[in-house]
Curated annotation (Swiss-Prot):
The gene is ACTB. This is Actin, cytoplasmic 1. The keyword Ubl conjugation applies. GO terms for cellular component: actin cytoskeleton; cytoskeleton; dense body; focal adhesion; nucleus; plasma membrane; protein-containing complex. GO terms for molecular function: ATP binding; hydrolase activity. The modification Tele-methylhistidine is found at residue 73. The modification N6-methyllysine is found at residue 84. Polymerization of globular actin (G-actin) leads to a structural filament (F-actin) in the form of a two-stranded helix. Each actin can bind to 4 others. Identified in a IGF2BP1-dependent mRNP granule complex containing untranslated mRNAs. Component of the BAF complex, which includes at least actin (ACTB), ARID1A, ARID1B/BAF250, SMARCA2, SMARCA4/BRG1, ACTL6A/BAF53, ACTL6B/BAF53B, SMARCE1/BAF57 SMARCC1/BAF155, SMARCC2/BAF170, SMARCB1/SNF5/INI1, and one or more of SMARCD1/BAF60A, SMARCD2/BAF60B, or SMARCD3/BAF60C. In muscle cells, the BAF complex also contains DPF3. It comes from the Eukaryota. It comes from Cricetulus griseus. Its EC number is 3.6.4.-.
Amino acid sequence: MDDDIAALVVDNGSGMCKAGFAGDDAPRAVFPSIVGRPRHQGVMVGMGQKDSYVGDEAQSKRGILTLKYPIEHGIVTNWDDMEKIWHHTFYNELRVAPEEHPVLLTEAPLNPKANREKMTQIMFETFNTPAMYVAIQAVLSLYASGRTTGIVMDSGDGVTHTVPIYEGYALPHAILRLDLAGRDLTDYLMKILTERGYSFTTTAEREIVRDIKEKLCYVALDFEQEMATAASSSSLEKSYELPDGQVITIGNERFRCPEALFQPSFLGMESCGIHETTFNSIMKCDVDIRKDLYANTVLSGGTTMYPGIADRMQKEITALAPSTMKIKIIAPPERKYSVWIGGSILASLSTFQEMWISKQEYDESGPSIVHRKCF
């Protein structure tokens, strides 16, 4: 499809917003889902001060701003700020007029009904889009992997969900949510690096720790054994150069940090780990479809990018499942953006074109139309 009429695909995550054009194989814009407002009026006199900043600009000016994340644990909690993020997406990042393009938005599994209505209302009334659609994030990830049945373990910055999907439909009664994701792991790494004598506290330093996490952390296949290896040799140590030129060395922190996904007790949480949550989701499904879920367990989201995570999931779920069960963990290399990619695929299918909610339908039925047309 041509850019001039291509649908826009916007995946709003707790940490990052991914946006682009349907039919593309990757999002054109990826920026932090943050809105910043000046802490003190008039502190930037003569700089053409704006009353708010979004994304990377808010991030770079964070010293003089109060930063807010309008999406918490995957769910929009601040609609005024969310509107600013969408405005920034259309006009500054994609440089398009939203009234000229259909818009596909994504939502968290189990998103409250009122929220989807509010999204619909803002798209039609504030941005005057000709058509829109709301799709569940995990379902799009499954489509991106070329499947319509499977269970998706989607873990991003703010929340982790396990979502069983059968023939393209998410099974709401079996979806489980775990409030443990990338942001918690970054915080945990800050904490364990502090125990090593390196101090990271400010939001600027948190970004450095996030980078260390993304570059050096991995999931151990056998945690106890890895701890023993780390204690007896320096083979697992890596060094990292901080922006000021100081070099720090990290050892067992590399795998202790993401281990919290499998042992939330590390963070003082009583929840089950991601392997057990996935298993529990499968067990909430009809016995006849479990086989299909075990054999199609798809990882999605930035927090599934750790090396070793798929092998560890395979090992842990094999230990929980019936002994004869075939278990397959699918970890596509592009899984950081698979929700967006699934949206790009869906919105460009010829069969999908009659699925859009049109402005006319919205005017006739109001925001509740979204429950009838998007599921």
